[in-house]
């Protein structure tokens, strides 16, 4: 059944892209079919075929090895903080890795290695799909760098691109992530294999949705022989490393500031929504009632009381308060879920489930997004009992951004023994298939705030196209999101088959 659901999801995503097309008769079947086949074939090779899985693991291990070298610099700056003596610290273990990878990529660009790889892969995409060289090069560059850096490889041609080419460049940037932030996601616990696979699948996936929603109707420039030199090229390797580190620091500061602001704003919104929810019968009152009922059920026998007290003690320790000072409505709802889910005594099963359900039912922005995007998550292959949680992450990624979504998703990637979170609707850890689907679905810059980034980046390179960029921005977010969801659906399909 899950295989059938994944296939249905693929068809529906293609149909949605077709519905959004601005010229259905002009769709080039060779380009669209070829892009889909490349995206699916690559996903199948690295997620299903044993040799491909081994290659993907080798690449991922190599990237992890490079990240480990970044830790030497982190330890030099932060000392024992880098050794997790105070637990996982985002500002210590993630943001510096972004700086390191930005510097490394700048060095690879200076040495010409990145251009060589982009030229080969971009040329292959061009020949396979019949797309122009400019959009193929930009799509390939997005595998390695971000939405503002990738267009630099075709910067002189942006003012004269056709509208379809410009749209493809926009979608390519939104469907992918930068290599520097990919390292940051890996440090948060997202499997590197999934991040690498998603980055490569984003190139054909972005072109697929771009050419489905905005097919080419004009003649294109297809006479680019070599990639243009960067007029701001560093004078030597050291200059490249330094400029890359500076750019990485700016990116890391932006990421840190963004997370601080958005997580705080989400907490504020949740507080406001929670008050409204309590008036509607949700929230604290329902949780307190369910908890009191569990207390009464546990008082029936000493054995039940001991089991209840054990869970209560674990909750108090997590909240850093004494048991007699613990107020069930004032602690983190996820802690309540984790503490009372393990109560397996038949006499307490119903009452403890009521507590877990009441804690999970607390109205929040994440819950609202979960219900809105729940059908979409189910459509791309997430089991129904995990679809609301998955839908919440997808919604956060589109409405806020992928870094915030990954930060809320990361605890579910851990083993329960290492402090991982339980899915409230199932009472157990998240399934491996759902972890994979969400990892792929979130792996892209396609969100509302990225429209402003595109306007600033591409608009600065071609001020004459700023009006078109603004007009196409929302459609590009839709296309980029569809590309991410297609990769996620295919990943779920091949993981199920394997």
Where are these regions (language model features)?
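N-terminal alpha-helical transmembrane segments of multi-pass membrane transport
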Residues: 1-94, 239-242, 259-267, 304, ...
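Hydrophobic core segments of alpha-helical transmembrane domains in multi-pass membrane transport
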Residues: 9-20, 35-47, 95-107, 176-184, ...
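Hydrophobic alpha-helical hairpins/lids featuring a short glycine-rich hinge
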Residues: 69-131
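Juxtamembrane inter-helical linkers in multi-pass membrane proteins
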Residues: 119-153, 220-240, 282-288, 365-369, ...
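Alpha-helical membrane segments and immediately flanking helix-loop junctions
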Residues: 126-186, 391-478, 482-490
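Long, contiguous bundles of hydrophobic transmembrane helices that form the permeation core
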Residues: 200-254
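Transmembrane helical segments that form the transport core of multi-pass membrane transport proteins
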Residues: 249-423
């Amino acid at each position: 059944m899950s295989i059938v659901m994944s296939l249905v999801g693929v068809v529906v995503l293609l149909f949605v892209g077709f519905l959004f097309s601005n010229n259905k008769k002009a769709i080039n079947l060779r380009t669209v079919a070829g892009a889909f086949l490349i995206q699916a074939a690559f996903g199948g090779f690295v997620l299903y075929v044993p040799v491909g899985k081994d290659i993907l693991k080798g690449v991922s291990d190599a990237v992890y090895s490079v990240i480990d070298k970044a830790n030497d610099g982190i330890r030099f700056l932060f000392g024992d903080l880098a050794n997790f003596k105070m637990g996982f610290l985002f500002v210590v273990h993630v943001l510096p890795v972004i700086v390191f990878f930005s510097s490394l990529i700048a060095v690879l660009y200076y040495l010409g290695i990145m251009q060589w790889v982009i030229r080969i892969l971009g040329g292959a995409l061009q020949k396979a799909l019949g797309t122009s060289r400019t959009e193929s090069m930009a799509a390939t560059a997005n595998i390695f760098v971000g939405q503002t850096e990738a267009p630099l490889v075709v910067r002189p041609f942006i003012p004269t691109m056709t509208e379809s080419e410009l749209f493809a460049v926009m979608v390519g940037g939104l469907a992918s992530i930068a290599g520097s932030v990919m390292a940051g996601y890996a440090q948060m616990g997202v499997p590197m294999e999934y991040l690498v696979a998603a980055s490569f699948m984003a190139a054909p996936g972005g072109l697929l949705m771009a050419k489905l929603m905005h097919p080419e109707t004009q003649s294109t420039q297809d006479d680019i022989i070599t990639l243009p030199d960067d007029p701001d090229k560093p004078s030597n390797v050291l200059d490249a490393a330094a400029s890359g580190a500076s750019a990485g620091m700016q990116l890391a500061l932006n990421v840190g500031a963004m997370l601080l602001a958005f997580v705080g704003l989400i907490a504020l919104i949740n507080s406001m929504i929670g008050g409204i929810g309590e008036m509607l019968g949700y929230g604290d009152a329902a949780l307190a009632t369910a908890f009191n009922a569990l207390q009464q059920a546990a008082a029936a026998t000493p054995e039940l009381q001991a089991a209840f007290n054990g869970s209560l003690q674990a909750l108090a320790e997590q909240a850093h308060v004494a048991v007699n000072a613990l107020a069930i409505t004032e602690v983190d709802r996820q802690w309540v879920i984790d503490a009372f889910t393990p109560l397996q005594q038949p006499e307490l099963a119903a009452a403890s489930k009521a507590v877990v359900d009441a804690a999970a039912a607390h109205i929040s922005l994440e819950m609202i997004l979960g219900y809105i995007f729940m059908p979409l998550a189910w459509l791309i292959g997430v089991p129904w009992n995990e679809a609301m949680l998955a839908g919440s992450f997808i919604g956060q990624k589109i409405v806020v951004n992928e870094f915030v979504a990954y930060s809320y998703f990361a605890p579910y990637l851990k083993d329960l023994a290492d402090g991982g979170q339980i899915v409230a609707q199932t009472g157990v850890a998240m399934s491996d298939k759902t972890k994979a689907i969400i990892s792929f679905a979130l792996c892209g810059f396609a969100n509302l705030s990225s429209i402003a980034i595109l306007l600033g980046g591409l608009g600065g390179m071609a001020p004459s196209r700023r009006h078109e960029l603004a007009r196409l921005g929302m459609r590009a977010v839709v296309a980029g999101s569809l590309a991410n969801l297609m990769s996620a659906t295919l990943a779920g399909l091949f993981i199920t088959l394997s």
